[in-house]
Amino acid sequence: MENARPAPGEELSPGAETVPRLAATVILLRDEDGLEVLLAQRNPGARFMGGAWVFPGGAVGAQDGEGEAALRAAAIRELREEAGVRLPDPAALVAFSRWITPAAVRIRYDTWFFLATLPAGAALEIDGAEVVDARWFVPGDALAAADRGEILLVFPTIKHLEQLSGFGSAGELIAHARRQTVAPVQPRVLGTGETARIVLPGEPGYTR
C-alpha cells in the first residue's frame, strides 16, 4: 500500500549498514473527545520527513546522560523544545514501543516511544523552526485525514496510530503499556526507488 513507503528524504544506503542512533519520542495523550494524541508537523523545508506529522521526539544527546535515564531525559527535552510541554519528571513516561530503522536506510535510529499524559494546565507552544504546527487528533481521525491527503504521515506514525485507535482512554492505554514487555521492531525495505516498500516482521517478504 502507499503508506508502506520510506519517508520523504529517507535515503536508502548503497553501502555498508550504518549503526542506528538512539532516539526518544513522546506519544502525548489527553482525554477530550475520547482518547487524543498530539502530532507535530515538521518544517516542510526540512530535508528529512519535511511536512510530516509526527510524535514529538529526537535523538539522544550528550547532555541527556547515559542508559535508560538518557532516553527519558531526551524525551522530556524534545517535548519541551518542540511543543512547549514540560513533564514533571521521568517517571511520567511509560515505555510503549521500540522501533529500529530498517538496515537498508542510510540514516538510522533506535527509537523508544514513551506514553505520557498532558499535565494539568499545560499549553502547547511550538518552536516555529523544526516544528511549525501541532494539533490534537483522535487516532482514527488522523489516519482518515492522511487517507484524504490532508496531512502527511510516515510509516511508524501510521502503525502506532492504528494501535492507539483500539483504546478508549489514556488510562486504559497506559495500563496496557505497563503490563507489556517492550520488544524491538525492525521493519525491512523491499525493492528500491519507486518500488520500495516497508514490511514488518511476520509479513510476506520479510525473511527474504
Where are these regions (language model features)?
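N-terminal leader/linker segments that precede catalytic domains of diphosphate-processing enzymes
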Residues: M1-V131, R135-R208
